[in-house]
């Protein structure tokens, strides 16, 4: 925890500066003109120069050209949709699959309320939140890895056979 220096309002020098309107920059460096005129343009122009330089030096295609007459056997979404895709793929009832898919963001909306149950920040002193996080992470990884496998091996990750 940092130490905050509080100004002594009984100091006559500080009172004179506050009377002149100089109190807000008394502790630190002003943003105008140092940051706004010198540092920000360098950062912005440097970022633009890096992007243009990479585009000129390494002009690569964005993906492969599409072939409208050849559809792949297994269409996979982007990697961050793998767990939800796996839920839709393995649940036989479509309505139940959609309800489970909707429950993912609804469950994430409950996280702030679960976090505020305990005032401690140490994860070892918040066992409920830590357990929910670890189980959720394990399930998301399990579903995400399973989405990349064929449907027969997706639930067991190919580790054992279910007959």
Swiss-Prot record:
Chief place of localization: plastid
Keyword Plastid carried by entry: yes
Which Gene3D superfamilies does this chain map to? plastocyanin oxidoreductase (1.10.287.980), Single helix bin (1.20.5.510)
Q: Where are the transmembrane segments?
A: 36-56, 95-115, 131-151
This protein's GO cellular component annotations are: chloroplast thylakoid membrane
Report the record's Gene Ontology biological process terms: photosynthetic electron transport chain
How does the UniProt record describe the way this protein sits in the membrane?
Multi-pass membrane protein
Residues annotated as coiled-coil are: none
Assigned keywords, A-Z: Chloroplast, Electron transport, Membrane, Photosynthesis, Plastid, Thylakoid, Transmembrane, Transmembrane helix, Transport
**InterPro entries recorded:** Cyt_b/b6_C, Cyt_b/b6_C_sf, Cyt_b6/f_cplx_suIV, Cytochrome_b_C_euk/bac
Q: Where is the signal peptide?
A: none
**Domain of life the protein comes from:** Eukaryota
Give GO MF terms, alphabetically: electron transporter, transferring electrons within cytochrome b6/f complex of photosystem II activity; electron transporter, transferring electrons within the cyclic electron transport pathway of photosynthesis activity; oxidoreductase activity
Location in or out of the cell: Plastid, Chloroplast thylakoid membrane
Function, as annotated: Component of the cytochrome b6-f complex, which mediates electron transfer between photosystem II (PSII) and photosystem I (PSI), cyclic electron flow around PSI, and state transitions.
**Subunit field text:** The 4 large subunits of the cytochrome b6-f complex are cytochrome b6, subunit IV (17 kDa polypeptide, petD), cytochrome f and the Rieske protein, while the 4 small subunits are petG, petL, petM and petN. The complex functions as a dimer.
Record's family? Belongs to the cytochrome b family. PetD subfamily.
PANTHER family on file: CYTOCHROME B (PTHR19271:SF40)
What is the name of the protein in this document? Cytochrome b6-f complex subunit 4
Q: Which gene does this sequence derive from?
A: petD
């Amino acid at each position: 925890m940092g130490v905050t220096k509080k100004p002594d309002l009984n100091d006559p020098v500080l009172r004179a500066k506050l009377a002149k309107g100089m109190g807000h920059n008394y502790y630190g460096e002003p943003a105008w003109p140092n940051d706004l005129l010198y540092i920000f343009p360098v950062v912005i122009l440097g970022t633009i120069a890096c992007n243009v330089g990479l585009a000129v030096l390494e002009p690569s295609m964005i993906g492969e050209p599409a072939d409208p007459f050849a559809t792949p056997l297994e269409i996979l979404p982007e990697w961050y949709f793998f767990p939800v895709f796996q839920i839709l793929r393995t649940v036989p009832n479509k309505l139940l699959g959609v309800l489970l898919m909707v429950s993912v963001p609804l469950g994430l909306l409950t996280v702030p309320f679960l976090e505020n149950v305990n005032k401690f920040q140490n994860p070892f002193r918040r066992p409920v939140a830590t357990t929910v996080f670890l189980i959720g992470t394990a399930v998301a990884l399990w579903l995400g890895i399973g989405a990349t496998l064929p449907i027969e091996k997706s639930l067991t990750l190919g580790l054992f056979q279910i007959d």
